């Protein structure tokens, strides 16, 4: 039976003792906040329907929005998938551990709640020492979407998890800020050509050797994502100073995310991001900071849609759509 989470989750530095506690909680059916290289995840035992149901309750997540299952090692794939295609084996060898999720046919005994009722499951091996140690110690596949309320900016710091889900999570392991800052790339790897379902930390360019091709959408893409409690406005870099000045003249509290040379003085919240990689790393934290500082509108300088810039612009458009 799952254990009841405390009224408020605890945050612990990710020591070996804390990791052991987190593993015990996972095995007991509780929810654990887990650092990964992309964003923090809300972890539960992927083989326990009751534990996984707790993720959907905590996040307010639609039941047909499938979860990504995390493994300690590629050798564990057989625990959650029915068949590993040659393409999946090739991509896993090249990109795991790392921010690439492979969609494959789900094993028959994997709970349908984990897959959102779909016949497939997304799987990856994270490239974070705390996540890997937790998975190895727990010795169970872990379902782990981003550890935030659905629709909110994803968490890249342990305190973000507590802010959104503190009453639902038993423990948050603090592994420091997420290194990448945007979610994994999701690829359907069942066929002979990879189909990109979601842009992410591994770029299309990095998948070119495997002939990546565009696809309409991942199952959960129709839902609201990444939106803070303030307006997000996207502008070309050269237009940012004038846009900020015009908005400020109306009396609104204005924030901005842009290269430092474009950030004017007097902003209610300012985040300098000099390139797309830096913007990916800082984006969700910057949106949350703007929100907590009472910003009415945050103006963001767009970036070129190449490399990780595609994933960044995807997240920004969704945030701006509210």
Predicted regions and their residues:
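Active-site-adjacent structural elements in enzyme catalytic cores
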Residues: 1-322
